[in-house]
Design a protein with these regions (language model features):
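Gly/Ser/Thr-rich phosphate-binding loop
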Residues: 2-3, 29, 155
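Short, flexible, glycine/charge-rich loop motifs used to bind or transfer phosphoryl groups or to couple energy/partner
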Residues: 12-15, 54-55, 155
Length: 186
């Protein structure tokens, strides 16, 4: 039984079952600001033991994952030993896509909202500048920058092809710890 449900869309937890075993935390519609542009959106979730309360370290997660609602409805999920991919079939069931996520040792993609670059700390700016310098820069190879503005869409691509997703802290009010909400999105 689910003891409580935490949503990025609500100010307080919804208590469901006294003595429940787990807490479910989610961002139920990540990327919703992009609906009118037809960009993939999705759901981010985390399942935690109820005994630890709602604010506990991510290492305590029992399972976590993302659903992506786009040209395909897909699910990436982990229960702590690997990340697995599933696709919603025409029968209404999720089917194993036949691959376990393995991040490549090297990649040439990164996702960051470059429109915020004027607010970044110097180390972040240097890292991105090094990537953008391509083969002529200190990393001596070309990189591709991607940014959809939907964590689930950017995350799916990173998990599928490798890379890094960055939403760093910056100098704007309210962004001193980055933008991802730890309980719901990290």
């Amino acid at each position: 039984h689910v003891a409580a449900y935490l949503s990025e869309e609500r100010d307080a937890a919804i208590q469901l079952h006294d003595g429940g075993d787990v807490i479910v935390a989610s961002d139920p519609l990540d990327g919703s600001s992009n609906i009118d542009t037809n960009v993939s959106i999705g759901t981010i979730f985390s399942i935690l033991p109820a005994s630890g309360g709602s604010l506990q370290p991510g290492r305590n997660q029992l399972a976590s994952g993302i659903f992506v609602y786009g040209p395909q409805t897909t699910l990436l999920v982990t229960c702590g030993d690997g990340v697995f991919a599933f696709q919603l079939g025409t029968d209404g069931q999720f089917h194993d896509m036949g691959w376990q996520v393995r991040m490549p040792a090297e990649t040439s993609e990164f996702a960051i909202n470059a429109s915020n670059s004027r607010h970044w700390a110097a180390p972040v700016s240097r890292y991105i500048a090094d990537c953008l310098a391509g083969s002529a820069g200190p990393r001596q190879r070309n990189f591709n920058m991607r940014w959809v503005g939907s964590l689930v869409a950017d995350g799916w691509r990173i998990f599928r092809r490798g890379g890094i997703f960055l939403y760093p802290a910056d100098a704007r009010d309210g962004y001193d710890n980055g933008r991802l909400r730890l309980v719901y999105e990290a």
